[in-house]
Amino acid sequence: MKKEKTDKFKKYINIYLIRHGMTPGNQEHRYVGRTDEGLTQAARKELEDRREIFQKVDRVITSSMKRCIQTAEILFPYQVPEIQPGLEEMDFGTFEYRNYQELSGDPKYQAWIDSNGTLPFPAGEDLQQFKHRCCQNFLNSLEKIRKASGKDEITFRGFSSLHHHNEENDKETSAVFEQNKNDNEAVKTCVAFVVHGGTIMSILEAFAEEKKNYYDWQVKNGCGYVASTDYENGAIVLRNIKYIEL
């Protein structure tokens, strides 16, 4: 009986995980971490042209970096971005804002390549510490949403909002929408996280139902994922993950 009472007040939250648009450093294939640069003009135009793909969201959460805030303001102009500290990209240390050509021949860079990216960046961040930072602050964001809802329990479920011109995807998302619509006592919230490639990779490696390596979750600039997310017994799992390509 207690479970039935609790289930009546579940709050449904759907999420986007979106990587920021292209920056000058991204164009030149540089390691852009702590460098706080904005979007290129071409990226701004591309995002403006494609923002109809995204459903209206209730909240937008970003890192503190210009490139994420600018992307959020273009895609979701009706929402003020909420900055969540700790969702920033990796600190690349001495590799920061340099590209392969500039680093080629550097013994420290070669050692990092030979380690398959597992070594800490010289004078920068360790990969495992970075992953922990991103995941912890993702959870911190969800906890703020839970508290703001005034409910004791949040269940993250089916994502129905991807307006993509793909018949197969449309059928899948429509089915999920019908499933959620039938639960008429659910309160549905849609949250967009506009962050960095490494941040998204960290979150999905940790919480995706489909287990993949960190590097298998790479995402292009301006693209991202939608997910249906369950939050039960203190454990978060991201399900039904679909890639969004602009």
Where are these regions (language model features)?
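Acidic, low-complexity terminal tails and accessory targeting/binding regions
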Residues: 2-14, 90-101, 147-189, 202-246
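Phosphate-handling substructures
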Residues: 75-136
